[in-house]
Curated annotation (Swiss-Prot):
Signal peptide: none
Keyword check for S-adenosyl-L-methionine: no
PANTHER family: 60S RIBOSOMAL PROTEIN L18A
UniProt keyword terms in alphabetical order: Ribonucleoprotein, Ribosomal protein
Gene Ontology cellular-component terms listed: ribonucleoprotein complex; ribosome
Species annotation: Spodoptera frugiperda
A Pfam family matched in the record: Ribosomal_L18A
Molecular-function GO terms, alphabetical: structural constituent of ribosome
Similarity comment: Belongs to the eukaryotic ribosomal protein eL20 family.
Gene3D superfamilies the record matches: 3.10.20.10
Descriptive protein name: Large ribosomal subunit protein eL20
GO biological process, alphabetically ordered: translation
Amino acid sequence: MKAKGELKEYEVIGRKLPSESEPKPPLYKMRIFSPDQIVAKSRFWYFLRQLKKFKKTTGEIVSIREIPEKSPVKIKNFGIWLRYESRSGVHNMYREYRDLSVGGAVTQCYRDMGARHRARAHSIQIIKVEVIKASACRRPQVKQFHNSTIRFPLPKRVHHHKRLNTFAYKRPSTYFL
C-alpha cells in the first residue's frame, strides 16, 4: 500500500461466497485506513487471508463505505496501537497523536513511522485507534499541549504593505528573536 495523501477510514464488510455446505456464511467487518476504496478492498482481502482460510476468488465484498468524522472541528488525542515489520523482526507499538480526525492521526502515524523507523506503509498494520482523554495521555509530545495557558512564539513577522515604501534600500528583516 502507498500511503499517499490524507488517509480515510473505510468500513469494509465481506464474506465467503455462499455454497451448498454453507448457505449463509458469516460476515466479517473491518475498519481500514487507506487513500481510496480500491486500496481499502485490497487491504481487506490481505488481512482476511491472514485471519481466515479464504481469499478474493472465493469471497465477496458486501459493502464498503467511508466513515465520516463525528466532530471534525474539535481537536482530539488519539492512541494508536500498531504492529510493524522492520529489518530485525516484528514489533508492537503504541503511539499518541493530536489531530482533528482519525484519518489525520493515522496519516501522521504513517509519516512518523517512515521518518523515525524507516517502516514502509505496507509493513505497518493498525490494530486499534482510540480517542483518549487528556488525563490518560502518556507521551510528552502530546501532553505539552494540554496546558491552558500555553503561548506560542512569533518567530517571523510579516511587514504590512501599507507601511512599506515603494522602493527599499535594504531587504526587510523579518526575524525578531
